[in-house]
Amino acid sequence: MEHKEIVIGVDLGSRKICAIVAEFKEGILRIIGTAHQDSKEINSKAIKRGRINSLAHASNAIKEVINSAKKMAGLNADEDRNNPMPHFGEYHPKTKAIVSFSGAYTESIRDVTGVASTKDNVVTIDEINRAINSACAKAGLDNDKHILHALPYRFTLDKQEVNDPLGMSGTRLEVFIHIVYTEKNNIENLEKIMIQSGVEIENIVINSYAASIATLSNDERELGVACVDMGGETCNLTIYSGNSIRYNKYLPVGSHHLTTDLSHMLNTPFPYAEEVKIKYGDLSFEGGEETPSQNVQIPTTGSDGHESHIVPLSEIQTIMRERALETFKIIHRSIQDSGLEEHLGGGVVLTGGMALMKGIKELARTHFTNYPVRLAAPVEKYNIMGMFEDLKDPRFSVVVGLILYKAGGHTNYERDSKGVIRYHESDDYTRTAHQSSPTPHIHSSPTERNLSDLKAPSAPLNTAKNDDFLPIKPTEQKGFFKSFLDKISKFF
């Protein structure tokens, strides 16, 4: 009988929930259904910056999106919901999902090393697996932590640096890795909510990683590139160098803050400020330039829509431009903090919903003057077909990246959120992708190997948690912008 697998990608974003249903058949991954809800349709109590705030509210929102995508795909949306779930853990949905995870609730450890000795003087995937797990154990994470990604970026074999040690002769393999982890409670809550939504988690991928998979070229990753997923309430930065992830950072700024600035500064309710941003947003505007329309009439806060006032269009656009510039300054500081600024031959790539704002690329280029800047949307690659036109949009980079991750878009070697080693036999990602567990995976000519007995135990480590929401620290501003930013800084 012909093997067919259904997989779902689910992006739990700050301002929207997205789902893609894909089918694996005859070595090809084909998208057959998609759905999403934006912030106007999602209960604000459900999800905040990617974190589950209410199991009941979140499960309803996620379930609705997933079922809509299933219906488009011609699947029975209720096939998993008809089974009772008296207790968590007693119910196992038929459908599996790859789910995004917000960088807001992760920490990372850089430059951790692990060592493994070879058998028969040849490096196999077993030795690479043991070296990676050795590094994870050496990181000394507490038992209440969960590793999402362990990402090797450098190998040495008998003290000689090599790009890919697999199959090479040698006795001592050393690996240098970048680890991304979170609290186990976060993972357990995510698992509960997804089961209540009718799917079982197959894997978890941080959103910035998923976005980079969907948008970056192999050349950019090899040269070094900073990929910024610009969302509603967050920006998530991932930096590649030498085709490996070297740095990731969550930044508590997004397009939502432009709306908040407009609401406070123009004395208008938030929903109207959002409409103003969408209708009149143009980040290419600079003070003193002529605009098509000089004034805009907007409702006044506290008047229940019965009173309005006039504001210059130039003021609206200047407010948004100043906040966007401040966002790029924050992103730039994070790039500098990474120590990798001199390794960005591929420049800066912007994706996510905020990247759709008119003039954002031109504004970014005025700030990032030392390297190229481009806007990116998802593209078809890694044996994936059926990309709907609606998905070729920066807003859907993360959810498309989740499916591409399944299709082999992960880095050359990786220990994933399930503790499984994923790898490619060469740097050419169009070739066969492998994983070390017996779980079927989407790609042509899969190789399955069970290395679960090679997992290394965890050891204690006390680490500081990420701040839930960090304040924006603006640089010196002139005129009313300084007063305004000082006034509202406490809100962010």
Swiss-Prot record:
<comment type="similarity">
    <text>Belongs to the FtsA/MreB family.</text>
</comment>
<keyword id="KW-0131">Cell cycle</keyword>
<feature type="region of interest" description="Disordered">
    <location>
        <begin position="429"/>
        <end position="458"/>
    </location>
</feature>
<dbReference type="GO" id="GO:0051301">
    <property type="term" value="P:cell division"/>
</dbReference>
<dbReference type="InterPro" id="IPR020823">
    <property type="entry name" value="Cell_div_FtsA"/>
</dbReference>
<dbReference type="GO" id="GO:0043093">
    <property type="term" value="P:FtsZ-dependent cytokinesis"/>
</dbReference>
<dbReference type="GO" id="GO:0009898">
    <property type="term" value="C:cytoplasmic side of plasma membrane"/>
</dbReference>
<keyword id="KW-0132">Cell division</keyword>
<dbReference type="GO" id="GO:0032153">
    <property type="term" value="C:cell division site"/>
</dbReference>
<dbReference type="InterPro" id="IPR003494">
    <property type="entry name" value="SHS2_FtsA"/>
</dbReference>
<dbReference type="InterPro" id="IPR043129">
    <property type="entry name" value="ATPase_NBD"/>
</dbReference>
<dbReference type="Pfam" id="PF14450">
    <property type="entry name" value="FtsA"/>
</dbReference>
<comment type="function">
    <text>Cell division protein that is involved in the assembly of the Z ring. May serve as a membrane anchor for the Z ring.</text>
</comment>
<protein>
    <recommendedName>
        <fullName>Cell division protein FtsA</fullName>
    </recommendedName>
</protein>
<feature type="compositionally biased region" description="Polar residues">
    <location>
        <begin position="291"/>
        <end position="303"/>
    </location>
</feature>
<dbReference type="Pfam" id="PF02491">
    <property type="entry name" value="SHS2_FTSA"/>
</dbReference>
<keyword id="KW-1003">Cell membrane</keyword>
<dbReference type="InterPro" id="IPR050696">
    <property type="entry name" value="FtsA/MreB"/>
</dbReference>
<keyword id="KW-0472">Membrane</keyword>
<feature type="compositionally biased region" description="Low complexity">
    <location>
        <begin position="436"/>
        <end position="447"/>
    </location>
</feature>
<comment type="subunit">
    <text>Self-interacts. Interacts with FtsZ.</text>
</comment>
<feature type="region of interest" description="Disordered">
    <location>
        <begin position="288"/>
        <end position="307"/>
    </location>
</feature>
<keyword id="KW-0997">Cell inner membrane</keyword>
